[in-house]
Amino acid sequence: MSERQIHSVSMELAGRTLTLEAGRFAEQANGAVVVRYGDTMLLATAVASKEPRADADFFPLTVDYEEKMYAAGKIPGSFFKREGKPTDSAILTARLTDRPLRPLFPEGYRNEVQIIVTTFSIDMVNDPAPLAIIGASAALAISDIPFLGPVGAVQVGYIDGKVQINPEMPDMPNSDLDLVVAGTKDAVLMVEAGAKELPEDLMLEAIIQGHQVCKQICDLQNELVRLAGRPKREFVPPPVDTSLEEAIQQWLGNRLYEAITDPNKMVRDAQTEALKQEVIAHFTADEPEEELEARIAAVSTAFENLLYEEVRRMILERGERVDGRGPKDIRPISIEVGLIPRVHGSGLFTRGQTQVLTLATLGSPAEEQRLDDLGIETTKRYIHHYNFPPFSTGEVRRLGSPRRRDIGHGALAERSLLAVLPSKEEFPYTMRLVSETLSSNGSSSMASVCGSSLALMDAGVPIKAPVAGVAMGLITGKDGRWRVLTDIQGIEDHLGDMDFKVAGTAKGVTGLQLDIKTTGITYEIMREAFAQAREGRLYILDKMNAVISEPRKELSPYAPRIITLQINPEKIGALIGPGGKTVRGITEATGAQIDIEEDGRVYISTPDAAAAQQAVAMVEALTREIKVGDIFLGKVVRIMPFGAFVNLAPGKDGMVHVSELDVGRVENVEDVIKMGDEINVMVIGIEPGTGKVSLSRRALLTGETAEDRRAAGAGRGLRDGGGRSGGSDRGGDRGPRGDDRQRPRRR
């Protein structure tokens, strides 16, 4: 057996060392590379089937990102103590890795390719997401799989007014930008970003700076290819029967143009499909039975190619789109809010034949989503879920758990609203939004952004500004011509070269997603796309503002009311009680949900205003800082010969000495009060250290102050700190000691 050859290359990146290593792990994979950056370490593998998939009319690429809990020194929390289905975070990282790689495989390549990225070590400093892209690209680059890469990737932040490459994870909460850019040495391929209302020129500058570093990372991968690369498999693209296309084009004449130029998607699709079947019938009529299936496939492919060319020719040569719009035109928009009863907020956004209904639900802080993945355990108080049922495109499909696309679209819309949400101090609610795609003809994710903004305002959430989103497309020609399209629909997304989604306020960008279907786009195209996107976004915002321009002043009557209290953190234990008994008792008595933060913030949530006030009173009574001079209405809970104990708050009693019960001399405590009586008392002393409380009923009867009673009772031990046993039991006008206290007799 030959000795294993291990090859490694490194570069300095943002003050840390980025290392790529091949040859140590997974030797049976077509390509395997370990990426290390700081102490974050990933293994990326690439494997391709030996033969193309016969039934595939698409490129069968699968990318999986495997989060292993050992990478963060954790044991999985499930019953089986084993990793289960991928988390949303893992799915989003897999999609992020897939998107820049997919355009770089040869046209017509149909071999199955599987990329698996496995986390070996996570240091909580260096984000693994861009490293997954680098590792996957490097594994493909050194393999024998046909690939037009490599691809570099970096994270870009904007902190203290400066663009920063690969900021450390603890610094990201202070960043106004969280952007991942990926590209080859020649062009940008993918961008994913969330931002705090940043201007378009700054976003473009961040992309450009990030891409410059991507070029260096591509050089590093090429160096590894020189050391460890394998010869590429020979791949010959399937031949294109141009004579068949020409024959179909001549037979069709102008009929294809007439079929696809209808503003209604359903009519257009029906006409196009009918024409396609007519073409197939005509050009397979004389085909022998044994060759019929292959001939049908060839005619179908030729027709689709003609459709592709016709749509693109219309746009490039005449600026004409299939629904009659110009390149910058936006489809008709319809907006409604408050449609659905009992939900806390709703917004219906319709743009052309894309329609999304977004519904908002407000909950207590206890309903925040807990995230326990490879990162630090955190919670999420704003949650957005996107649903794409089959009826939205007139299809029949089995319903099941959310698909990767659904999770990705939901995350994009969620990220696009984060910049305008109120802080927890301003608005302590947990917010869950669900976008139901009711009809789809392109750009449903951006319709979800618009619907989310509408639903939040309808729910009375005090967002800083409305947010809208628009999807931009691109058509490029072989002669270098190109056109950017505003508000693309399904056919333009399918047949175009770019899907560039931009969300934001009137002030700036809050969300961004760029996917390219060619080998990249130039900075000039991106600059034009940003400009057109801003123009389109402002137009949509005007339409939205005409219906609802600011949050409603009142919450829905069906939404819980949350009251925030601030207590001394030292009182948290008293509020919770042993095993949570006390706080559960408040919930059982009032029906209110009580949530307690470590800093002493207490959230009381319930739709019932009276119950809320009752819960507030109980919490305040439990956590009230008792001070000398305070007056309480308390219940007598114990009577002794020397006085009575009065309950001031749950778990907190004080003692009224017999001399403080009444104005005159009291021989018997029960001559004045009985067990269960409620009496008004004043705090006249608190014993340091123990916190025992001395009370006086007499002070309230005579109009004296606590200071007066302490001065009068100096001889009885009522010093500044109060007397023993939580109250005074000495001196004054008491009777003999035997009347005051019963002592056990010694035997």
From Swiss-Prot:
Biased composition (Basic and acidic residues): 706-722, 730-747
Database matches in InterPro entries: ExoRNase_PH_dom1, ExoRNase_PH_dom2, ExoRNase_PH_dom2_sf, KH_dom, KH_dom_type_1, KH_dom_type_1_sf, NA-bd_OB-fold, PNPase
Location of the region described as Disordered in the Swiss-Prot/TrEMBL record: 705-747
Co-factor(s): Mg(2+)
Catalytic activity: RNA(n+1) + phosphate = RNA(n) + a ribonucleoside 5'-diphosphate
Alphabetized Gene3D superfamilies for the sequence: GHMP Kinase, N-terminal domain, K Homology domain, type 1, Nucleic acid-binding proteins
Enzyme Commission (EC) number: 2.7.7.8
Keyword terms, alphabetized: Cytoplasm, Magnesium, Metal-binding, Nucleotidyltransferase, RNA-binding, Transferase
GO molecular function (one): magnesium ion binding
Family annotation (Pfam families): KH_1, PNPase, RNase_PH, RNase_PH_C, S1
Annotated S-S bridges: none
All copies of domain S1 motif, residue ranges: 629-698
Ranges of residues in domain KH: 560-619
Predominant subcellular localization, coarse grouping: cytoplasm
GO cellular component: cytosol
Ligand binding (Mg(2+)): 493, 499
Gene Ontology biological-process annotations: mRNA catabolic process; RNA processing
Function: Involved in mRNA degradation. Catalyzes the phosphorolysis of single-stranded polyribonucleotides processively in the 3'- to 5'-direction.
Similarity comment text for this entry: Belongs to the polyribonucleotide nucleotidyltransferase family.
Name recorded for this polypeptide: Polyribonucleotide nucleotidyltransferase
Organism the protein comes from: Roseiflexus sp. (strain RS-1)
